[in-house]
Amino acid sequence: MKKIISLLVVAVLFCTAMVGCSKSESVSTDGSTSMSKVIESLSEAFQEKTGTEVTYNATGSGAGIEAVLAGRCDIGLSSRDLKDEEKAKGLEGTILAYDGIAIIVHPGNKVSDLSLETIAKIYTGEIKNWKDVGGADGEIVLIGREANSGTRDGFESITDTEDKCKYRQECTSTGDVITAVSSNPNAIGYASLASVKDSVKAVSVDGVKPSEATVKDGSYAVQRPFVLVTKKDTKLSDSAQKFFDYITSKDAKEVSSGAGVVPAN
């Protein structure tokens, strides 16, 4: 009887160990809504390659950075560089790719090109009517992102409009900006180039059309980095480290390019 019980205990322990080994540790990411397309593409490719699940919580750049600090995720996602005060807290940023910030209008808007200076004047309220920039008579409706958005931070930094923009509507995601602009003939907004759809029109900036090629060669001025955020002195789990190594490797370059961004490596 004792021998039978011992064999049963060994069998149970063996089965438990096998179940534990069969489960891959998941990887959690949190942050920028603009990075959804590229991070979802990379996560899918990594899962097919390794069987490890990668979760993505689209909360915005600022919230993603806070999630890393609080230990709520493995890797944070930011569509802007880390600030000095964030680095001082022990955070480290690794550039994954570069993305253009498209200036978008309603498809029916006949304006197709704006200078960086004109864009700044529009968003600060100095220019208020489309007829003043070659469009139809209509009050310009300014759509932007919420405070702590990496896209907003990048846009305002490049156009030198920090704390000066006269937003009519502040959206909490890239998709919401696109929806708002597509439904209003007088609206203007900004959004990740990788996320822009046919429901809106991306205008040229100083004569340069936003594209992967013009972001890569630097001729398109309105661009920013996509950054992976980690704690400098905290070791990632084995699965998270493997995911980090994969998405920053040359092996993932084609996947990133397919998602509409310019890989940093």
Predicted regions located by residue number:
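Exported/periplasmic ABC-transporter solute-binding proteins
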Residues: 4, 22-265
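Conserved functional loop/turn residues at catalytic and ligand-binding sites
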Residues: 8, 12, 72
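Positively charged n-region of N-terminal signal peptides that target proteins for export
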Residues: 1-9
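C-terminal motif of bacterial Sec signal peptides marking the signal peptidase cleavage site
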Residues: 16-20
